Amino acid sequence: RRQRQMCIRDKDKRRLGDVVDLFTNIQMIEHGSEKDILGRTYEYCLSMFAEQEGKRGGEFFTPSCVVRTLVEVLKPFKGRVYDPCCGSGGMFVQSAKFVENHSGNISNISIYGQDSNPTTWKMAQMNLAIRGIEPDLGTYAADTFLDDRHPTLRADYIMANPPFNLSDWGLDKLKEDQRWKYGIPPVSYTHLRAHETTLHL
């Protein structure tokens, strides 16, 4: 049974890769309504895959209702927006929508982020490209805590849904890291790692 579940997961990952490749090969659309339809279609594909993955799908997809709430609270009209574990880029997409819906200028916000999963990182790049958003997600997929691609960044807005309850997140390699201003996070409290990282920015 376990082998069958692994086989199904592998097939699902291949399907996800096919979806990403499909959108990668689509010529970018400049017109607003058509571009919005393409973006919504891509977002729908991501949500369906996340739903099928269940708990594991949360590593790249945060429910849109949660993202909208975060953005409405922060109101990122202008400045640098950062997500250290950006997944498929939902935080960035919603930030851009917020600016547009309030008659703001999308060029007034700068997008920064990264993700450790190469497929997810590619998904984020495409999710943003479809909507005409030019982000800085680093030149390759990388773990924020072990390989920070934006070490000098000082963000104005930080939104994140970081991975929790990781048993091994590389603490032994980061004991002297400058981000631990308030103390080294215990191995069993991985959420503190994310909190201290955002406070450092």
Predicted region positions:
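Non-catalytic, mostly N-terminal accessory regions of nucleic-acid modification and defense proteins
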Residues: 1-5, 9-77, 136-149
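Short, small-residue-biased leader/transition segments that mark boundaries at the very start
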Residues: 3-8, 194-197, 201
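Alpha-helix N-cap/helix-start and coil->helix boundary motif
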Residues: 38-39, 89, 118, 198
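A short, gly/pro- and small-residue-rich
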Residues: 175-185
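Conserved Class I SAM-dependent methyltransferase catalytic core
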Residues: 188-193
